[in-house]
Amino acid sequence: MSEEFLKYYNRELVYLRHKGHEFGEQYPKIAARLRLSEEVVEDPHVSRLLEGCAFLTARIRQSLDNAFPQLTEALIGQLFPDFHAPIPSMSVIKVNGSSSATSTVTVPAGERVTITAPGFKECDFLTCYDTQVLPFDVAEAKLENAPFSGADARIEADAKSVLKLSLCSNSDEISLANSSDKKLRFYLNGQSQVALQLYQSLFKSCIGIALVQKGRSKKELTPRHLKAVGFCDEEKVVPYSKRSFSGTRMLIEYLHFPEKFLFFDLLDLDLRAFGSEPQGEIWFYFNESNDWLEKQITSDNIQLGCTPVINLYKAKMKPVRVQPSEYEYQLHAEYMEPESSEVVSIDNVTLRNWNKVYDNLPPFYAGQHTNYRTQPEIYWVLRREDKNWAGGFDEPGREAFVSVVDKQHQLFCPESRENWLMSVEAWCCNRNLAAKIPFGGGLPQVSMPDCKDNFSKIKCLSTPTETIRAEMDESSRWQFAKLLTLNHFSDDAGAENLRQVLSLLAFRGTPETKALIDAIKGMKTTLTTGRVVQNGRVGFCNGTAITLQISEQILSREQIFFLGNVLSAYFSQFAEINTFTQLTITLTSTGERFFRWPASAGEKELL
C-alpha cells in the first residue's frame, strides 16, 4: 500500500466518525448503542466495523480518482509504450585480457555479467556494446602543450598540444602487429570534468592523428577517423523497444547515464605500422592548448576493453490459472524474491489448456488486431502500479499486472473446467538492489559466468545508478499532454519546448539537470540549403539550421559541447526525407559562435 492510500483511509475514517456522531445526536433512540463521537468509539466491535468500511470506501474512492490517470496511462502505453517502464541500474565495466592471450576476443552485446559483494545478493547485468578484449592495453597517457617533442608528422606545425597514448602488449613476445583489428574503442574514464574536457578536445580541437613507433610517425590519420559512440540504435543502453522514438531514448540516456556517450572509436587502423615491437604510440594533435588538463591526464582516464552494462535478465513468471473471478494477475518472477525482482517489459505471453496452446499473444495496444479465423482474438494488457512494500520489506518499486482480453477489451472468462494456464516471460531487473552494492576498495565483484574465455580481471568503473521510474497517477495527465505537443521547435516557443522536453525526461530532477535546463536561453530555426556529396556526386539539399543560445555562466564549455553533441543527434532524428538538420550553439555572454556540428539526417552526416 502507498502513502496516498493512507490519506484516503484516514479521510474516510474521519468522515464515518463525524457523520456517525451527527447521526447519533440526531437519532439518539436508534443510534445510542453505537456510542460514537468524533474523538473516540467506545465499542471496539463498532470501531473495527468502521475501520473495515473506511478501508473499502477508501479503495473505491481512490479507484474513482485514478480513473482518469488510468486512461492517460493507457494512452501513454499506446503511443509511448516504454515511458512508464522502470529504467534499471547501469554502469561501465572493464575487461582485462589474459596475459597469455595472443589475439582479440570479442564479447558480444547481451553477454551476462554478475555484480555482487559480500553480504549482498547477486545482480544480473547485460553488456550493451560489442567489446574488444585486446592482447594489449593503454600503458601510459599524457597531454603535452607546445613546444613538445615531435614525431615528424606533417600536422605538427599547426598543433598546440598533443595527447600521447602508449600501447603495450600483455607479453613481450607478442607484437602489436599481430592484432588484425581495424578499430579501437576507447572509454574516457574518471572525473566528469576531466572526461568532458578530453571529449571536447577530441571532437572539437583534433586536427590529426599519428601512429608513432620509436619517436617516428609511421602512419597519419585525419579527424574523420574519430567516431563518437552511443548515437545509433545498435548502441542503445536503455532497453526501449523499436516503437519508442530513439531521440527520446537518447535524451533519457544523456540525462541519467551520460557515461554511455564517453566512448569513441578510432577507425581504419593498420597496426602493422608498429612492426614487430610489443609497444607503440598513438598521438592525437589538437589546435588548442590546455594547461589544466595537462596535469590531470593519466592512463586511468583512457581505457580499452570497456562496455556499458545494464541490470537486466530474462525470467519466467510464476504460472497462474486463468479464472472467471479474477480480472488481472500480478507478475512474480520464479525463484526470485519480490524485493529483488521487478518487471521491465513483457517478452511473451502464452495461454494453454489440455488441448489448445495460444503462444506469443499480442498486446492489446499493439495495433495489430487480426480477424483471421485461424488465430485467436485474445490479447494481453499490462498495468503498472507503484508499491512501497515487497516481500515483507519497505522497498519502493513498480509492480506489473496482466489482464487477458478480447478485441472488445472484454475480459477473457473461460469456464473453470477448461483449466487455462497463463505463462509469461519478461525482462526484469533486481529492483533497487544494484545501487546498494558498495563501490570502491576492490568492490563490487564482477564476473561473466557464461563466457568461456579466461579474463585476468573484470572491474566496475562507475557506481551502478539507481533504478529510475517516471512518475505515474496524477502526473500522467501532464506527461500525456506534453508528450503530444512538445516535439515542435520551429516556432517562437522552441527554446521553452526544448526545456520542457528535458524537464519531462529528467525523472529525478537533480540540481545538475535543472542547471542544464536553465542554461538554454534561446532557440532559432531557419530554412537553409546545403551541398551534399554522395558517391562522388554533388547535389543540393534543403534543411533546417538550428541555433541554440547557451549560458556560459551556468554550464562550462566542455558541458556545453557534450550537450550539443547529444542535441545534434536528437534533432537529426526529426529530419524528413531529402532534408537535414544542422545545430549551431552560440554563447550568451559574447554572442560568438561556439561550435557548428555537421549537417545530418538520422544517423548519417551529410555535409
Task: Name what the model sees in each region.
Residues L56-L64, D82, S149-D181, V309-R352, ...:
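Extracellular ectodomain segments of secreted/surface proteins
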Residues D172-L382:
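Short, low-complexity Pro/Thr/Gly
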